[in-house]
């Protein structure tokens, strides 16, 4: 192979590599954050209506709307600073937070009697 042919081949490979890098990332921008609302209904036995796993992606806004037949507090582990929902029997209560940590986090109900039970989970995927 001549020096000229070698140079043309090297330039072609470099251009193809650059085009791959440019077009590989084009059109794959992450979806913008979403607002997600989940409705849960609780009774003495735990979750009776609503999803057991509340799914989100980093940056999403999550609203949890809860109706319970007993008093207590609902909170999301690792997100205590963001969401604590005080529950009154028969009344709708809600809390909102931004999913700022990826992972799976338990949603726990602490009853007025001190009972502590997981009723659902928040699962946050990386963006």
How should each PLM-predicted stretch be described?
Residues 47-49, 72-75:
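Short, solvent-exposed loop/turn elements at domain surfaces
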Residues 75-82:
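Short, surface-exposed beta-strand/strand-loop-strand elements in extracellular ectodomains
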Residues 42, 56, 68, 76, ...:
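Hydrophobic residues in beta-strands and at strand termini
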Residues 53-70, 92-101, 105:
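Beta-strand cores of secreted/periplasmic/IMS beta-sandwich domains, seen most often
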Residues 70-72, 112:
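Short histidine
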Residues 2-9, 15-34, 88-127:
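Extracellular/periplasmic metallocenter environments
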Residues 39-41, 63-65, 73-75, 106-108, ...:
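Soluble periplasmic/extracytoplasmic beta-strand elements of cell-envelope proteins
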Residues 31-61:
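N-terminal edge beta-strand
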